[in-house]
Amino acid sequence: MASQAANLWVLLGLGLAGILMLTKKLKKTVREDFGAFIDKLMLLPPPQPAPPKAPHPLTGLTFAVSDVFDITGYVTGFGHPDWVRTHEAASSTSPVVSTLVEGGATCVGKTVVDEFAFSISGENKHYDSPTNPAAPTRIPGGACSGAAVAVATNAVDFALGIDTVGGVRVPAGYCGVLGFKSSYGAISNTGIIPVSSSLDSVGWFARDPNTLRRVGHVLLQLPFATQRNPRQIILADDCFQLLKIPVDRITQVVTKSAEKLFGRQLLKHQNLETYFETKVPSLKEFARTKAIANTKVSTSRLLANVMQLLQRHEFLQNHGDWINTVKPAIDPVILSQVCENPELTNEETENLNAIRNETRVAIGSLLKDDGILVIPTLPAVPPKLGSKEITSEDYQNRASSLLSIASISGCCQVTVPLGHHEKCPISVSFIGRHGGDRFLLDTVQTMYPSLQEYSSIVTDPKSSKKAITKEESAEIAKEKGNQAFKEKLWQKAIGLYSEAIKLSDNNATYYSNRAAAYLELGGFLQAEEDCTKAITLDKKNVKAYLRRGTAREMLGDCKGAIEDFRYALVLEPNNKRASLSAERLRKFQ
C-alpha cells in the first residue's frame, strides 16, 4: 500500500507536463510497432571484406521476414498458434534469408501473416492484426500484412514475404509501399512453408525503388548488365474496368509518366479478355468440365477460378493431414474455402497445368523482352476493418481476376504506390514476362520518380485538371480508339473517337479516324460528313480525301469521288490508292 501511495505521489509530482510526456511515450511505442512483429531477433551479417574488395551490397540495411520463412532456433508459426504448438524449432535457416544476411543486411524480426498465409485481408483472429499505418481504420492486406506494415512504418528497410494469390502485392497496395512478386521458380522456396506449391513465389517490400532493386539483384543473383528501357507499355483496358475508383486517376499518371520518359509511341492498349480467349484454349475445357461452358464467364474470371482451385487443392495436399489430425480452430471464411475444394482427377490436373503454361506463353508473346503490362493492383481502396467487403463475392471476383494474371502465368509483378484516393493508398501494377525480373526492376527504378510526380493527379483532382488538359485526354481517347479499330471493334472505336471529338472538336484526325470506322460499318453518309469536317479543319489531310472519296463512291457520287481522289494525288502524287481509285472510276464515266 505504501509502495502504491509512493508511486501515486511520484506521478502527481510529475505534474501535467509529466503526464503528457508519459502519454506521448506510450503512443510512440504503439506507432513504432503497429503490431507488425511476432518475434524480435538479430541476425548479423559477416564482417566486410578487406579493401580493395567492394563492401557487401546490402550493407546498412535492416529487414524482417514473414513468419513462413525458417530461421534456426525459431518455430515458423504460419499464422496459427496450433501450428507453433505442434512443430519444432527450425534446424536451419531458409536460404533466402541467409542470402540476404550474407549480402550485408541485418534481420531484426519475424512478422505477422494471415492464418496459414491463405487470405488477402491481413486480419488474423489469433494475433492482434497489424495496423495499417497509411489508413488505420482499414485492413492492411495479406497474407504478409506484418511485413508490409514493418516497411511502411520505417521499422525496417525491406521485408520478405510469400506471394501465392497476392500475399505481397495486396498488402503493398493497401499500405502504400512497393511490393515485388518474383517470377515463379526464380528464387528457391526451400525453408519456406508451402501454401500452394505451383503458385508460391518469393516477394519483398521496400519504400523506394533503389532498395527494391538492390534486394532483387542479391536474391536473383543477377550479374551487372546495362539497364534497359521498355519499348512498349501496354495498358490492359478491360482490367481497368474492374476498378471502383476513377480509372483516369491511375491511367493518366502512367500515361503521362511514360510519355515524358519514353514518348507516346510506346503506349499501347490491349483487351486481355479477347487476347486470352484465343491464346489460352484450355480455358474452354476448364469451363466445360466445371459446367459453366454455356454461361457467359469472362476469361479473367475463369483464370481466377483456376487460381483459387489450385490454391485450395494444393493447400490441402500440403496440410490436409495435419488439419485432420490436430483439428485447429480455423477462420470460418478460410475453412469454407478449403472445404469447398473437390478432389481433382489426373485429367483435370493436366488441364490446369496446360492453362498455366498457355497463359505464361501468351503473356510472353504479348510482352516479348521489352514490354510491360499495366493493370490495377486491386479494384478499390482498402476495405474498412471488420467489414464484409473483402469477403463479398463481388470484391473477391474483381480482386482475384486481377491477381490471377501473374499468379497463373508465374510472371513477375510489382505494386507501385500512386498516392491516395479518399485518404486511402492506391497503386498500379506492372507485369513483366516470366524471367523478366531484372527488366521489371529496372523499369520501376526508371519510372518511379515521374510516377510520383504525376501521382498528384490522383491525390488532388484539381491538380489533375491542370496536369491533364482536354487535348491530352482527347489524345488518350483517340489512341484507345485506334486500338479498338485494330481489333475490328468498329462501334467501340466510333465511341472513343466521338469522346475525343467531344474533348477537342478542332482536330481533323479525330473526324477522319471516325470516318474510317463508319466506312467499315457501311455508314457512308456519316463517313462523308466526318471527312468534310476534317478537310475543313485541315486542307491537306490526305486520308480524309481518300475516305470521303470511298464514301462518295459507295453513295453513287462518282464525280465527287473522282475529285477527292484527284485532290489526294495533288497532295501525294505517288499515292497508289488514289491513283487506282481515280482510274477505276473514270472507266465508268
From Swiss-Prot:
Repeat region (TPR), residues: 474-507, 508-541, 542-575
Membrane topology: Multi-pass membrane protein
Top-rank lineage group of the source organism: Eukaryota
Keywords: Chloroplast, Membrane, Plastid, Plastid outer membrane, Protein transport, Repeat, TPR repeat, Transmembrane, Transmembrane helix, Transport
Tissues expressing the protein: Expressed in roots, cotyledons, leaves and flower buds.
Matches recorded under Pfam families: Amidase
SMART domains: TPR
Localization of this protein: Plastid, Chloroplast outer membrane
Reported phenotype of the disruption mutant: No visible phenotype.
Residues in compartment: Chloroplast intermembrane: 1, 163-398
PROSITE patterns noted in UniProt: TPR, TPR_REGION
UniProt topological domain (Cytoplasmic) ranges: 23-141, 420-589
GO cellular component, one term: plastid
Transmembrane segments: 2-22, 142-162, 399-419
BP-aspect Gene Ontology terms: protein transport
Signal peptide (residue range): none
InterPro entries for this protein: Amidase_dom, AS_sf, TPR-like_helical_dom_sf, TPR_rpt
Quaternary structure and partners: Part of the Toc complex and of the intermembrane space complex.
Comment text on domains: The transmembrane domain and its C-terminal lysine-rich flanking region (LFR) (26-61) are both necessary and sufficient for targeting to the outer envelope membrane.
Described function: Chaperone receptor mediating Hsp90-dependent protein targeting to chloroplasts. Bi-functional preprotein receptor acting on both sides of the membrane. Not essential for an efficient import of pre-proteins into plastids.
PANTHER family on file: AMIDASE 1, OUTER ENVELOPE PROTEIN 64, CHLOROPLASTIC
Annotated protein name in UniProt: Outer envelope protein 64, chloroplastic
UniProt source species: Arabidopsis thaliana
Gene, per the UniProt record: OEP64
